[in-house]
Amino acid sequence: MLGRNSLGLILFIIALFYNCSTKKDVLYVQDVSDKELYNVSYDEYKIQLDDVLKISILSKDPETTLEFNPSASNVTNSKEILLYNGYQVNQNGNINFSSIGEINVEGLTIIQAVELVRKIIVENKILIDPIVDIKLLNTHFIILGEVNRPGKYDFFKNNLNILEAIGMAGDLTINGERKKIKVLRNKISSDKSRFKKIFSVDLTSSDFINSDAFQILSGDIIIVNPNSSRIKNAGIIGNSGTLLSLLSFVLSSIIVISN
């Protein structure tokens, strides 16, 4: 005969196992020992549409140099300063650079863009030996889903990795699927056609350190889907309350029949 105390214990155990995630579901990088070392390589960022570039020119002729280095002394808003000082890459992949005109920079690395701008200035005999510096002003990523602070985040370091990006968003929630994080990235092919590439990242395995998605690039979108426990709890069929109510009814019926 099944007593009432036994019934309560059964229901408690079922609820405990149904709702709890295992360590394998939530721990990061589970296959790494303290002695293991990893060589991490970072790819150079390639300029995309809508990027804002700050281009600084230095030379022995300061008067001619002034036209390439506008001053934002009358602008107080930080976003306005960003746009005022920068050259935005238009839908054709070009920037309209001062008196020189349009320069196609889409798909170039920052170093390649520096070399191109310097070459054009010298070939047009504007400056003899200019020093060119280019910085990307609007580096950002977007993170959505099961993180504590989803949203758009600006960053200003050259090599940002996915763990740092997740940390900026307050870490994953306990309901985040750590084995199938998606990273959407803008890409440009050799024929200049544009597309998005989707990476899948498993944070429970050290393999992701060698993934192309380990490095987060400007414009990346990170999507953290809910894990199976979260989906079950949110559903109707898999809802734990529904399941326990049904089980309670069945067990209660057994007790009544047994008595």
Predicted regions mapped to residue ranges:
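Sec-dependent bacterial lipoprotein signal peptides
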Residues: M1-C20
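Ser/Thr/Pro/Gly-biased, low-complexity, turn-/loop-rich segments
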Residues: L2, C20-N259
